[in-house]
């Protein structure tokens, strides 16, 4: 009879093979053991390293400890207290669950495990040795908690040991692991030593407030990061994104400040990283740089598979596209909110109630109160830059035939260079238009188009200093503010009720005052195209916005709606027009097209915007 070729490997060899996946270097050992301490409920963890971890790794914690009866199994393969069924595997919240780390580590090192639970009078120590990895137990002296010592890593696998880097390099990797874990666990104290010298000491925070968490982030990522970062809190259903994202000006040529976590588990997930980098594409971040961020994604554990990578560095989302778009929209909204505030500062129009530490951009968060979030917008709201403007290309649909005819004549006319029209205007004594209150560009005046066709009784003549439209009506000249015209056009378009669904519904929590205001605004908001549902949760009204007017789709909706609920605005179109994207450059064709559109729908309001100018004094001198 032939000797069988297939046989079962001895435990030590099997464990060493498994260690090839789990134990890559000393930092891998530290990660596995510290995660075990966290699962044990420890709030203070001591990490002692000697010679980069090759000589000694000692992890001491004050967790729940391991009873004598469980010590032997703790070092066995596929033995764990974390899961016991397939259903548990699909709902994992613990950091460890496979039950192979201690067995794998003990197969390539001299490992001793000393532990004592609170209900046990004395501590016991366990270690495994020999070909069969038999576990021996003996009494020891130890406080409540656990200490694991890993000595002479890879002593029995010389090939693995020779691939270790210098002590300094290996300790750098250990330091990074501790930093990553400490970022996710601000309520845990960590102490890291190397060769008897304390290198890191992170004290546990007093509470779980954002301010306390921020202290831990600053201690690890630096004050420069936290001073140039936006706090984000974005939620939709079972998805919750929170943390800090750095402004584009602190992006880095390397990805050493890219920290992402899923349900408290540190990882480098491609879906998360891609969504965040895509969100920064619309910013002025230098090409090739990496954004700086510390973000935490909380998700229903049944919607994510953490058992897809040997070292658990990656996960697989059941609805990857939804998660990607959720993160993308959250980060984009945060960056957009900051860009608006920065631009407001540039034009010296500060938002009075803005505070840096409030979560001003987290449109999906569930705990936004008016006293913290409402932002009062002045009449001179910051103007977005031209690169962020929607397409205002001229169109003739819905415009009167006379306007279409005029537009055809306009585009066929050559542009004639003329004298600066500003020099020809002498306003009446009581005329002080806002358009001339700003600093005037003294550069060469732009070409002016002069036309003879009229829109209704309006005859557009020229663009003045890129701020006003010069008109003639009934032998009288008028100036029309282009900014006010753009806002009026925005108002008239809002009344059409054209709406667009949100990819991720916007969730808002209202206080009592906001709730009263909401009750009076339900119908007007619905008429403008908003689709908003409400429900009561813990005595508080919560709104879910699923559809908004098309013109507001790209705006900071959370900020706008909370400001509306805090205001006493009656005309909603006028209120929303404050947020209209106003171009910084105008062509005569655009201005005429807007005039033609608005003249049809808001003629009386348009009449109120014109300001008469008198050329008689100039003409008398000619």
Swiss-Prot record:
GO biological process entries: mismatch repair
**Which SUPFAM superfamilies did the record assign?**
ATPase domain of HSP90 chaperone/DNA topoisomerase II/histidine kinase, DNA mismatch repair protein MutL, Ribosomal protein S5 domain 2-like
Q: Which CDD domains match?
A: HATPase_MutL-MLH-PMS-like, MutL_Trans_MutL
The molecular function terms of the Gene Ontology recorded here are: ATP binding; ATP hydrolysis activity; ATP-dependent DNA damage sensor activity; mismatched DNA binding
> Is Protein biosynthesis included in the keywords of this UniProt record?
no
Q: Which domain of life is it from?
A: Bacteria
Q: Mind telling me which GO cellular component terms the entry cites? A: mismatch repair complex
Xref: PANTHER family = DNA MISMATCH REPAIR PROTEIN MLH, PMS, MUTL, DNA MISMATCH REPAIR PROTEIN MLH1
The record's function comment reads:
This protein is involved in the repair of mismatches in DNA. It is required for dam-dependent methyl-directed DNA mismatch repair. May act as a 'molecular matchmaker', a protein that promotes the formation of a stable complex between two or more DNA-binding proteins in an ATP-dependent manner without itself being part of a final effector complex.
Which family, according to UniProt? Belongs to the DNA mismatch repair MutL/HexB family.
Report the protein name in the record. DNA mismatch repair protein MutL
Q: Which organism is it from?
A: Actinobacillus pleuropneumoniae serotype 3 (strain JL03)
The root-end lineage is:
Bacteria, Pseudomonadati, Pseudomonadota, Gammaproteobacteria, Pasteurellales
């Amino acid at each position: 009879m032939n000797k069988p070729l297939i046989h079962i490997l001895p435990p030590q060899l099997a464990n060493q093979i498994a260690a090839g996946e789990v134990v890559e270097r000393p930092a891998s050992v530290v990660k596995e053991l510290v995660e075990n301490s966290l699962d044990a409920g420890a709030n203070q963890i001591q990490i002692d390293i000697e010679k980069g971890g090759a000589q000694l790794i000692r992890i001491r914690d004050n967790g729940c400890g391991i009873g004598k009866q469980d010590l032997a199994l703790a070092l066995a393969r596929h033995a764990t207290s974390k899961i016991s069924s397939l259903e548990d595997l699909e709902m994992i919240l613990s950091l460890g669950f496979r039950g192979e780390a201690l067995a794998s580590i003990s197969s390539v090192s001299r490992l001793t495990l000393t532990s004592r639970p609170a209900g046990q009078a004395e501590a016991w120590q366990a270690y495994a040795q020999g070909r069969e990895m038999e576990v021996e137990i003996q009494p020891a002296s130890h406080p409540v908690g656990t200490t694991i010592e890993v000595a002479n890593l890879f002593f029995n696998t010389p090939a693995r040991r020779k691939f270790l880097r210098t002590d300094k390099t290996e300790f750098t990797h250990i330091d990074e692991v501790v930093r990553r874990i400490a970022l996710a666990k601000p309520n845990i104290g960590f102490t890291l030593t190397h060769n008897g010298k304390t290198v890191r000491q992170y004290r546990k925070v007093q509470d779980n407030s954002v301010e306390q968490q921020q202290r831990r982030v600053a201690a690890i990522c630096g004050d420069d990061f936290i001073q140039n970062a936006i706090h984000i809190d974005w939620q939709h259903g079972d998805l919750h994104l929170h943390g800090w994202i750095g402004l584009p000006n602190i992006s880095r040529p390397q990805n050493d400040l890219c920290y992402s976590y899923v349900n408290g588990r540190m990882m480098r997930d491609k879906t998360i990283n891609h969504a965040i980098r895509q969100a920064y594409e619309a910013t002025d971040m230098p090409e090739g740089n990496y954004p700086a961020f510390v973000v935490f994604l909380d998700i229903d554990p049944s919607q994510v598979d953490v058992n897809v990578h040997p070292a658990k560095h990656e996960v697989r989302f059941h609805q990857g596209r939804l998660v990607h778009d959720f993160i993308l929209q959250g980060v984009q909204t945060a960056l957009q909110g900051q860009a608006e505030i920065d631009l407001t500062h540039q034009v010296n129009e500060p938002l009075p109630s803005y505070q840096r530490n409030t979560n001003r951009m987290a449109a999906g968060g569930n705990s936004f109160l008016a006293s913290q979030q409402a932002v009062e917008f002045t009449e001179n709201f910051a103007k977005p830059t031209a690169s962020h403007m929607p397409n205002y290309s001229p169109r003739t649909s819905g415009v009167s035939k006379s306007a279409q005819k005029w537009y055809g004549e306009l585009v066929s006319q050559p542009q004639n260079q003329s004298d600066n029209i500003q020099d020809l205007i002498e306003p009446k004594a009581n005329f002080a238009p806002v358009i001339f209150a700003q600093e005037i560009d003294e550069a060469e005046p732009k070409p002016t188009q002069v036309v003879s066709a009229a829109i209704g009784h309006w005859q557009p003549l020229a663009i003045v200093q890129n701020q006003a439209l010069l008109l003639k009506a009934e032998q009288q000249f008028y100036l029309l503010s282009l900014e006010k015209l753009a806002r009026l056009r925005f108002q008239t378009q809002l009344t059409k009720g054209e709406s667009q669904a949100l990819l991720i519904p916007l969730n808002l929590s209202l206080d009592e005052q906001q709730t009263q205001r909401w009750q009076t605004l339900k119908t007007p908001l619905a008429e403008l195209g908003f689709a908003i549902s409400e429900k009561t949760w813990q005595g508080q009204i919560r709104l879910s916005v699923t559809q908004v007017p098309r013109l507001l789709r790209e705006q900071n909706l959370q900020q706008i709606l909370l400001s509306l609920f805090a205001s006493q605005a009656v005309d909603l179109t006028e209120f929303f027009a404050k947020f209209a994207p106003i171009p910084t450059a105008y062509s005569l064709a655009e201005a005429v097209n807007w005039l033609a559109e608005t003249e049809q729908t808001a003629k009386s309001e348009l009449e109120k915007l014109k300001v008469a100018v008198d050329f008689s004094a100039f003409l008398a001198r000619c």
